[in-house]
Structures are given as structure tokens and as C-alpha cells.
């Protein structure tokens, strides 16, 4: 079975704040406001002591157990108590492809829209039915994604393992009865190509796999084309991750690494953030060359020299792969790519609103509102001249000190002003948010400013 396209995100810059993205209707991730239980306004996850409880079907995949363990620890960070399993729990979790006849019958009696997700890989449903919060996944990954969506609803960031981000303490957690979510991926294979990752060890790969689980990514691209036994055992088996190698995606299962199924990926498409470099297909050899040997985008003249270009097809994309050296360098971009892979209307309200929402999820609405102008200005300045290009003769991009009202001085002044605003806002933050603020906001801003001053 052939998949016609794979998107390789060579650059994940945020130069597009001037873009006007809009859409007409929601898709993939659906939030319904139809009342399903008028007797109770909210379904509380917590008991009188503030402890969250859940119940799950008897037979589940290993990745679901990993997600449950993460969820239990997440709830401890929010309520002070780890979530526990309990038969009469308000949260009822089901992995569709592992249900017994009795369990499936019980799920049908609850009225969950099983038919909407049962035939789609990685899909899930979360909603209130008969005074219970029902969580259903079509397969192992879908169930794990749904469980970790609960963590996000409770205020736990997917990046909590990578940054010093502590969720806001809560005595109770609840879901209104008139809300439900159906997650159906638009892109079948969503993942990362870890470029220059030979320094990684199994512990770091496991950490990346946890992040992928929280971001709902399911694929790792083998840039070096080599399988490592420890890598496969720790990541592929445990986290149910697909491996893309030599333009083939393989899903593995079991300790003996038996092949489950395999798909061939053709017509590799590259997505760039530079307006001068339009989206177009390039041959696999070129992309592999870029993945292995370069950490920057080719110039327009370099691209013109390539003779193996061809017309893009109009069929559906089957894979989106983000080429990164370290996922920690692009948290917003990776989150945005994941959201768009699940819902093409994720940016319906515009990029500025998306940025605001993302910061609110990390720091809360009060602090997020303060930070948003800083990050918007940071992305604007780095799009004018990206820090990675400062020491490179990247075309005619040098600043002029005597022309255009001294654009060099104005560029550096804007960085100085941004640094001052950053320090002033940092002073107003509570102590438990300053470490996360430093990692996500202050460090990138000051680093970019220092590089600009140096060059």
C-alpha cells in the first residue's frame, strides 16, 4: 500500500505572524455543546478528598499502561493525590480493540458514539454519558492519547517533563455534561526526525517518546538509517511508535519485533517557512542529503540548481515529519504542527490567538497575557534575521547602518527594548513560574539578542 506524500518540516520557524489564516468550520477535534444529562451540571473527577479515580477495561496495551502512569502522576501534581483505579470511578476508560463482549456491551449501554471512531486508527472520544466521563480509544494509541488529553484538561502541559512547568493546584476537577470531544487524526503518520541525535541514550529516547505521546505523534524517522536494538526495545515496543526508514513506515509489535504492516512513502514534500521558498516536492535523495548534512534551509539559488523537481500531487498527505535536533527548541511549533495534523481548523482564530492560548496553557491566563507580546516580538525579530543565519553569508541580508534610517541600530534597539520588557515582567511573576519563564521566554530572547549584538 502506497502513501503518496510525506511532509518533512525542515524548518519550524515562526515567521508567519502576519499570515491571515481562517477557516469556515471545525473538524477532527470536535467540541459539542449538546446537553446529554440535564440532572447534573458537572461530572467531578475528584472525590471529597480531592483524589481522582478512574476505571479501565481488563485487557489493555502497554502504551495505555504508560499513559495511565503518567496520568496518575499528573493528577498528583494537580490535586496532591495520585489518581487511583476504582470500579465505581467517575472516569470510565475503554480500549475498543481489546474489549470483551461484555465490556463492549456495557460501553454501548452508556451511549458513547463508538461507530464514529471504531474504524479509524488513533481516534478517541471523551464525553459525559449517564453521569460518567467516558473515555474511548479506537486502538492502543488512541486510548493513550485520550488519557493524556485528560491531563491537559486538568492543566498539565505536554512539556512538563521538559520544562519547569508546574500545574496550578486544584481541589476539584470536573467536566460539564454538555461537552464532548472526538479526536480523529487527519494525518496518518505524525512524528519527528531526530537530526544529529547520535548523542541520545535510551533514557533520552524514552523521554522523547513520552513527549510524542502527549503531543499525539506516532512516528520516528530514522535519519541515519540504522536500527539500534536498545532503541527499538525502549521506544518502539513500549510506546507503540512507528519507524520510518528508507521511505517506508513500519509498525512493530511484541518483544521479537515482528512486523505488523509496512507502507511505502513516495513523493517527499518539503514545507518551508520562508516566503521566497514556495512549497514544492523534492526527490528523496535531496531531502536525505539535507537531513544528514545541513541544519539550515537551502537558498533559492541552491534550490534552482536541483534538476529533480516535479509537480505536486493533489491527493491527501499521509505523513508529517518535523526535522529537529532537539524538540525543546521548538515547543510552540511542534504543538501547532500536531494540532493541525488532527484539526485543519486549529488556526481558525489566527496565529496570535493560538499563541495566546498556548501560553495560557503553560502559565495560566493572567501570566500568559503578559508574555504574549514578548513572544510575538521575539518571533518578529528572529524572522527578520534568524540567529542561526547571523554568521552566514545568506544572500543579500546584511543590515545597512547608513540607509533606511539606520536599520541596524533600529534592529538592535528593538532587541534591547524587548530584553528590558522581559526582565520587568519576570519580576512580577510568582517564584514557582520563573524557572519555566526563563526556559521558554527569557533564554531564547536573550540568546537571540546577544547573537544579534555579536554579529
Language-model regions: role of each:
Residues 23-184:
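Contiguous, structured surface segment used for ligand recognition
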Residues 63-66, 70, 74, 142-145, ...:
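Extracytoplasmic/secreted proteins, especially bacterial periplasmic and envelope-associated proteins
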Residues 1-10:
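Bacterial N-terminal signal peptides that target proteins for export
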Residues 123-128, 137, 141-164, 172, ...:
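Internal mixed beta-strand/loop scaffold within catalytic domains of large alpha/beta enzymes
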Amino acid at each position: 500500500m502506497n502513501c503518496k506524500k510525506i511532509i518533512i518540516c525542515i524548518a519550524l520557524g515562526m515567521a508567519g505572524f502576519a499570515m491571515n489564516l481562517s477557516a469556515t468550520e471545525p473538524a477532527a477535534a470536535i467540541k459539542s455543546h449538546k446537553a446529554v444529562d440535564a440532572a447534573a451540571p458537572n461530572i467531578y473527577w475528584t472525590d471529597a478528598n480531592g483524589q481522582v479515580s478512574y476505571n479501565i477495561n481488563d485487557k489493555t496495551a502497554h502504551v495505555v499502561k504508560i499513559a495511565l502512569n503518567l496520568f496518575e502522576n499528573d493528577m498528583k501534581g494537580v490535586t496532591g493525590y495520585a489518581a487511583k483505579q476504582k470500579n465505581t470511578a467517575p472516569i470510565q476508560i475503554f480500549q475498543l480493540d481489546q474489549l470483551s463482549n461484555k465490556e463492549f456491551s456495557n460501553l454501548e449501554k452508556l451511549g458513547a458514539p463508538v461507530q464514529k471512531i471504531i474504524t479509524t486508527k488513533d481516534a478517541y472520544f471523551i464525553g459525559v454519558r449517564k453521569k460518567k466521563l467516558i473515555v474511548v480509544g479506537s486502538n492502543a494509541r488512541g486510548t493513550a492519547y485520550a488519557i493524556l488529553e485528560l491531563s491537559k484538561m486538568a492543566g498539565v502541559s505536554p512539556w512538563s517533563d521538559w520544562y519547569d512547568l508546574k500545574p496550578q493546584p486544584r481541589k476539584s476537577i470536573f467536566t460539564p455534561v454538555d461537552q464532548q470531544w472526538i479526536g480523529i487524526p487527519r494525518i496518518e503518520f505524525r512524528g519527528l526526525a531526530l537530526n544529529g541525535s547520535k548523542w541520545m541514550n535510551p533514557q533520552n529516547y524514552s523521554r522523547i517518546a513520552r513527549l510524542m505521546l502527549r503531543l499525539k505523534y506516532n512516528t520516528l524517522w530514522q535519519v541515519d538509517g540504522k536500527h539500534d536494538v536498545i532503541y527499538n526495545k525502549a521506544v518502539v515496543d513500549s510506546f507503540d511508535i512507528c519507524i520510518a526508514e528508507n521511505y517506508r513506515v513500519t509498525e512493530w509489535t511484541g518483544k521479537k519485533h515482528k512486523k505488523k504492516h509496512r507502507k511505502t512513502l513516495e513523493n517527499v514534500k518539503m514545507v518551508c517557512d520562508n516566503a521566497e521558498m514556495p512549497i514544492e516536492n523534492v526527490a528523496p535523495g535531496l531531502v536525505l542529503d539535507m537531513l544528514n548534512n545541513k541544519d539550515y534551509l537551502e537558498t533559492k539559488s541552491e534550490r534552482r540548481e536541483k534538476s529533480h523537481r516535479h509537480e505536486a500531487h493533489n491527493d491527501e498527505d499521509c505523513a508529517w515529519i518535523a526535522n529537529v535536533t532537539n524538540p525543546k527548541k521548538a515547543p510552540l511549533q511542534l504543538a501547532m504542527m500536531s494540532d493541525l495534523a488532527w484539526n485543519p481548523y486549529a488556526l481558525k482564530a489566527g496565529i496570535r490567538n493560538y499563541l495566546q492560548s498556548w501560553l495560557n496553557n503553560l502559565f495560566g491566563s493572567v501570566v500568559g497575557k503578559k508574555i504574549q507580546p514578548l513572544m510575538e516580538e521575539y518571533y518578529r525579530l528572529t524572522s527578520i534575521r534568524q540567529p542561526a543565519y547571523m554568521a552566514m553569508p545568506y544572500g543579500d541580508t546584511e543590515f545597512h547602518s547608513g540607509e533606511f534610517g539606520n536599520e541596524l541600530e533600529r534592529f538592535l534597539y528593538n532587541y534591547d527594548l524587548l530584553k528590558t520588557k522581559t526582565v520587568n515582567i519576570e519580576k512580577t511573576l510568582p517564584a514557582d513560574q520563573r524557572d519555566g519563564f526563563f526556559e521558554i521566554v527569557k533564554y531564547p530572547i536573550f540568546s537571540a539578542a546577544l547573537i544579534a549584538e555579536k554579529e
